Structure formats: structure tokens, C-alpha cells
Amino acid sequence: MANSERTFIAIKPDGVQRGLVGEIIKRFEQKGFRLVGLKFIQASEDLLKEHYIDLKDRPFFSGLVKYMHSGPVVAMVWEGLNVVKTGRVMLGETNPADSKPGTIRGDFCIQVGRNIIHGSDSVESAEKEISLWFQPEELVDYKSCAQNWIYE
């Protein structure tokens, strides 16, 4: 599909523990995006430190790494037209208090430190995050039979 891009989405330990994995995947599927990579993992501290390297000088960095290491994470790669931008809209604001109802964080979160989900904020970030969490052979390229009903 022309102009298709990929994004990295991770359901954080609080989202996993609260049983929201299916609901989150359902929202991305119903929107029309295609799941091309999926892992259920206990992320290492080294992986998390690399993932959040841009935040390393922030006072909450060590707490964020500890929290993300506290339980399993669902790491995903989604593909589709404008999936990075649209995915961020679907997630809502980083601070759930600023998120609108109908967004994932607006519907399921209260505090910024437990905002259940991560989504790439740019195509460049998505490429970096995908390569950090997935090997190329772990991404599955296939044609969805629904594609012709979603895209012109």
C-alpha cells in the first residue's frame, strides 16, 4: 500500500496487569491498521534504558525504567496510512488527565505514571524503536483481505 508506515506500540505492565491487551489490540484492528509484529516479554533494564535514552537526564528516568521492568510488556508493530500520527491520537495525551474520552488513556487511565501504553511520536522514532525491540525476521509482511475495504 502506498504511503504506508509502521509504528511501535507497547502496552506497559499496568495495561497488561489490568487485562487491557485485547481491548487495545481491538481498537487498532478496528481502525484498520495491520499488526505485523507482536511480542509478550519481560523487557531487560538495558533494553528499557536504550528505549528511553532521550529521557535519561529527567528526574523520573530511573523510576520509569523500574516500572517498565516490573512486569511483562506487549510490544507491537502496526502498519498503515499515517499510523504514527493516528496511533498517537488513539492513545491520547501522555497525561491521562488531558486525554479526551474515547482515547485509550482517556478511557482507562488516571495518572501519568500509569498511562498503560507507549506509542512512537514520529516515523523516525518508530523506526528506531522497532529496530530496538524486533529483529527484521520477527516482522510479518502479509496482505490483509480487508485492505481493499479500508483503503481506496
Curated annotation (Swiss-Prot):
Recorded GO MF terms: 3'-5' exonuclease activity; ATP binding; DNA nuclease activity; enzyme binding; gamma-tubulin binding; GTP binding; identical protein binding; intermediate filament binding
SUPFAM superfamilies to which the protein is assigned, alphabetical: Nucleoside diphosphate kinase, NDK
Crosslink position(s): Glycyl lysine isopeptide (Lys-Gly) (interchain with G-Cter in ubiquitin): K100
Needed cofactors: Mg(2+)
GO cellular component: centrosome; cytosol; early endosome; intermediate filament; mitochondrial outer membrane; nucleus; perinuclear region of cytoplasm; ruffle membrane
EC top class named in words: transferase
CDD domains per UniProt: NDPk_I
Record flagged with keyword Phosphoprotein: yes
Active site: H118
Main location: cytoplasm
Record disease entry: This protein is found in reduced amount in tumor cells of high metastatic potential.
Protein name: Nucleoside diphosphate kinase A
Organism for this UniProt entry: Rattus norvegicus
Lineage of source species: Eukaryota, Metazoa, Chordata, Craniata, Vertebrata
Gene: Nme1
